[in-house]
Design a protein with these regions (language model features):
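Formylglycine-dependent sulfatase
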Residues: 1-224
Length: 226
């Protein structure tokens, strides 16, 4: 699971200054890893089923259904490479995999596949527009290097090839709040690196933990920018 949180907080400005600015919408983009379009229960419900030319699977997804009713649902958005790293490269840069720098799933045997440092990503664009930008969960768009914050000169894991990766601040493309990892599939035992590079091992089911972190982030930021 991964998510971009783009919060329209224009810094700590006086109320009059904030009121004079054009109102920007807050944006939360959630992308699971990975669902077929049909495995969302809301596609069989009123208000949704007549908007698409397929039938949803007979599944029960009450939380996703509620989220859909409170969100903007795109009925014809397609990924031309629905694979972990290439898709994230496209999402972040707006480029095809052969241009984003991420044509393959990233691991230590594939230096050819890593998000371009010179790419202007969605986080860069929103940050320049005054947004407070956060990234939560799986990134899997960087070539792993021996840059473990707690063990300089070492990779963040011992298995080979190395899949997991730590993303340093200079490679976060506008995301000023960070709670992420490269790729790690033990979702009952996840880990994350925060904005300052400290590792967290919460011992909690990853979707539940990440959702809680997102909610806390939004609540705290709302209080700061009242």
């Amino acid at each position: 699971m991964g998510g971009l949180t783009l919060f329209a907080a224009q810094g700590c400005k006086a109320p009059k200054q904030v009121a004079e600015q054009a109102k920007h919408p807050n944006i939360i983009y959630v992308f699971p890893d990975q669902y077929r379009n049909q495995v969302m229960g809301f596609w069989n419900q009123e208000g949704f089923r007549d908007k698409v030319n397929f039938r949803g699977d007979p599944v029960h997804t009450p939380n996703i259904d509620t989220f859909a009713r409170e969100s903007m649902v795109l009925t014809s958005a397609q990924s031309n490479c629905p694979l972990s790293s290439p898709h994230r490269g496209m999402l972040l840069t707006g480029m095809y995999p052969n241009r984003s720098g991420v044509p393959l799933n990233c691991n230590s045997t594939r230096p050819i596949s890593s998000l371009r440092d010179d790419a202007e990503c969605i986080g860069d664009v929103f940050s320049k527009a005054g947004y407070d930008c956060a990234y939560f969960g799986k990134l899997h768009a960087d070539f792993p290097t021996p840059n473990d914050p707690e063990n300089p000169g070492q990779y963040v894991e011992t298995q080979r090839p190395v899949w997991d990766a730590y993303t340093p601040k200079e490679q976060r493309h506008g995301f000023n709040y960070w709670y992420s990892y490269g790729t790690f599939d033990e979702h009952k035992n996840p880990h994350y690196w925060d904005t300052d590079g400290k590792r967290h091992d919460p011992k909690e089911w990853s979707p539940l933990h990440e959702s809680g972190k997102v909610v806390s982030y939004l609540k705290n930021l709302s209080l700061i920018h009242i």
